[in-house]
């Protein structure tokens, strides 16, 4: 497989509660998954990590402390990696706004739990990938509401 070539590569991690950090997908586990994905896809480690600890995934991405910092440094052809889509978003409307903004700026978003991170979900032209990503976003929103 040819390794993909992009500019800067960033990992984004999020947990919303201490309980989730202990018994869910911890920040350390997310960083480990993202690093492995980066090494596999790009043969290099991420250039940095942005971490929102104790922040709800329902909050608009750009209103989160590190979400905003990440937004401010991203440039065309950069990459954002997440371990799981629900670590990025927990509301379908947030997913749609992030995906559309990233697509418009040619920023590539990869999620390990979507096709093993093998295809950019923000710039994909595949109707099947787009449908699957929307379904995963819907499930993430449903799961957030069902847990409350």
What are the language-model segments listed below?
Residues 1-148:
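Short, structured surface patches at the beginning of a domain
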């Amino acid at each position: 497989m040819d390794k993909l070539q992009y500019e800067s590569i960033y990992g984004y991690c999020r947990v919303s509660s201490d309980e989730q950090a202990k018994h869910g997908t911890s920040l350390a586990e997310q960083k480990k998954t993202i690093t492995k994905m980066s090494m596999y896809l790009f043969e290099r480690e991420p250039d940095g990590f942005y971490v929102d600890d104790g922040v709800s995934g329902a909050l608009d991405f750009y209103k989160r402390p590190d979400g905003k910092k990440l937004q401010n440094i991203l440039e065309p052809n950069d990459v954002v990696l997440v371990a799981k889509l629900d670590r990025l978003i927990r509301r379908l409307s947030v997913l749609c706004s992030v995906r559309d903004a990233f697509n418009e700026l040619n920023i590539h978003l990869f999620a390990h739990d979507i096709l093993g991170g093998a295809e950019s979900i923000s710039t994909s032209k595949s109707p099947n990938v787009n449908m699957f990503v929307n379904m995963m976003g819907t499930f993430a929103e449903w799961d957030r509401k069902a847990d409350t």
